[in-house]
């Protein structure tokens, strides 16, 4: 992402190169990947993780031992209220993972830089609307 995609975009388009103007956004496993990239690269100052697979084995202990690479990042987290209501031994942990991730990020960045939105429904409920809300939240200028 940071070695090929961003340099290619910057070479072909007149885009800003600052972290506060560079975002990564994903849904489900893509949400996990977006959050992972935010921990690994200071390039991303806008991060969206919607119904991200934070239950993935080893991710939460790893995240607890790290800080986001961009100290001024703004993060949008979103999860459906029904997502943790399952018998699946992995997926049932998702709500606790999100609550913990929100806590970690708020400690690192401050409450004004972290938005956690709980939506009615499950993993596949109103995905386009949820994505739009996340993008609107991240692209809105931060409150001073």
Model-derived features with residue positions:
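Non-catalytic cap/lid and distal C-terminal segments of serine-dependent acyl enzymes
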Residues: 1-144
């Amino acid at each position: 992402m940071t070695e090929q995609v961003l340099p290619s975009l910057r070479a072909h388009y007149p885009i800003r190169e600052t972290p506060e103007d560079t975002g990564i956004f994903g849904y489900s496993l893509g949400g996990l990947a977006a959050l992972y990239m935010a921990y690994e690269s200071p390039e991303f100052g806008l991060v969206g993780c919607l119904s991200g697979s934070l239950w993935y084995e080893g991710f939460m202990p790893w995240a607890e031992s790290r800080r986001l690479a961009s100290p001024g990042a703004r993060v949008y987290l979103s999860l459906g209220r029904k997502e943790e209501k399952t018998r699946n031994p992995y997926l049932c942990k998702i709500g606790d993972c999100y609550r913990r991730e929100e806590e970690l990020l708020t400690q690192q960045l401050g409450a004004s830089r972290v938005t956690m939105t709980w939506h009615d429904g499950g993993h596949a409920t109103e995905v386009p609307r949820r994505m739009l809300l996340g993008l609107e939240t991240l692209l809105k200028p931060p409150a001073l």
